[in-house]
């Protein structure tokens, strides 16, 4: 099974990715991991990527796509993979289609975990962190016993500056605008599957499991 996982920040992608790869024993391939592995192995594309990163420059698409090609050609991807964080643009998605053709494979599903932006805002702005021990809480989903006080050490809880409502709303807005053309592209190809991410975590996975179970 060859899958792409999509979803806005706070949609619960990481949790679902863990469950998918654990059950189906396919590699979870994230962009960051791919780059780190290619640079460590000193592959041709990994060395090219390193030369840009060392200069503080953006890695060009052709290098990123080359790294993806190298990674998807590895033995552990024979039975399938879960791509996370790639592609980010329609140009990258088109290049991925070419890679898959060259490998004699196809993408089975693009799983988009859908959550209303208002709920995402609540999920992302509710986080509180202890100043003393770093313990993490959530005002709605995992609140401390006493408001603004850490259960573990009694330290004061605070909200990170980038978790405030305005910053999070802007981040979501940018993500929605960037993601829409990609979702439209995959909708047209017939790969896109929308998953209701507003349910309990286990129910979200159960829905994914029903969908992809037939591919195993």
Swiss-Prot record:
- UniProt xrefs under InterPro entries: Adenyl_kin_sub (IPR006259), Adenylat/UMP-CMP_kin (IPR000850), Adenylat_kinase_CS (IPR033690), Adenylate_kinase_lid-dom (IPR007862), P-loop_NTPase (IPR027417)
* Region (NMP) location: 30-59
Q: In which pathway does it act?
A: Purine metabolism; AMP biosynthesis via salvage pathway; AMP from ADP: step 1/1
Cross-referenced CDD domains: ADK (cd01428)
Q: Which residues bind Zn(2+)?
A: 130, 133, 150, 153
Q: List the disulfide bonds.
A: none
Q: Which HAMAP family match?
A: Adenylate_kinase_Adk (MF_00235)
Q: Which family does it belong to?
A: Belongs to the adenylate kinase family.
What NCBIfam families does the annotation carry?
A: adk (TIGR01351), PRK00279.1-2 (NF001380), PRK00279.1-3 (NF001381), PRK14527.1 (NF011100)
Its protein name is Adenylate kinase
